[in-house]
A protein has these predicted regions:
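C-terminal catalytic/substrate-binding lobe primarily of soluble NAD(P)-dependent oxidoreductases
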Residues: 41-189
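Rossmann-fold NAD(P)-binding glycine/threonine-rich loop
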Residues: 1-20
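Generic helix-packing signal
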Residues: 17, 39-42
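Short gly/pro/ser/thr-enriched loop/turn and capping motifs at secondary-structure boundaries
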Residues: 2-7, 27-30, 53-58
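Short alpha-helices
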Residues: 24-34, 39
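Short amphipathic alpha-helical segments and helix-helix/interface helices
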Residues: 9-10, 35, 39, 121
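General beta-strand structural signal in soluble alpha/beta enzymes
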Residues: 20-23, 49
Length: 189
């Protein structure tokens, strides 16, 4: 993730004869490609992407493994979530609008708002309703809200024993090994 609007970098990339491929993971990325494919085939009035990489083996307390940098996951929980409702961009708090959803062979997962639409907010702006929700095992939202409330995801540095540390950086460092998906650990997306 980077905070800049990738579409605003188009002219800079052209000027430097560079091809930049952004938002090209699972979501955003594969979800954008699937939406683009169907957009060519039919009129779309509503698009909802539900995504979450989860470990098959659930381990307390987080029951989560990050297939990418933990700091990016944690920032996803603090960055306002944008989606489209009735052709207007709406902004809500991340982790909001929680719902429980049942999946065959997986069980119940919780879903919540995250800011994953990114570039398709603009490239697919003709679709009147679009939303992305992240999926986690039940209880994850409450754990993350506790970390937020306690200040563990703050970006402003604090002083500890004469050292300046970032609570978010510190938390990410602690979670790095706990959230690392091992080479033989199974996960599903």
């Amino acid at each position: 993730f980077f905070p800049e609007d990738a579409l605003k970098l188009t002219e800079l990339a052209k000027k430097n004869n560079v091809t930049a491929i952004v938002d090209c993971g699972v979501a955003p990325g594969m979800s954008n490609l699937i939406l683009g494919y169907h957009n060519e085939k039919m009129k779309i009035d509503s698009f909802e992407c539900m995504v979450g990489g989860l470990p098959k083996k659930r381990t307390q307390p987080f029951e989560y493994k990050a297939p990418f940098s933990p700091i990016d996951v944690l920032e996803e929980y603090t960055r306002p979530a944008r989606y489209v409702e009735n052709s207007c961009i709406v902004t809500k708090t991340a982790l909001s609008d929680a719902e429980f959803i049942d999946f065959n062979k997986v069980g119940t997962l919780e879903s919540f708002n995250t800011d994953g639409l990114r570039s398709i907010l603009f490239t697919m702006g003709h679709i009147p309703n679009m939303k992305e929700k992240t999926l986690r095992y039940p209880g994850h939202i409450d754990l993350m809200k506790s970390l937020i409330k306690a200040g563990f995801l703050n970006t402003e540095a604090i002083q500890y024993k004469g050292q300046s540390i970032s609570p978010l950086g510190f938390t990410s460092a602690l979670l790095f090994d706990q959230w690392k998906l091992g080479a033989t650990e199974a996960e599903f997306t």
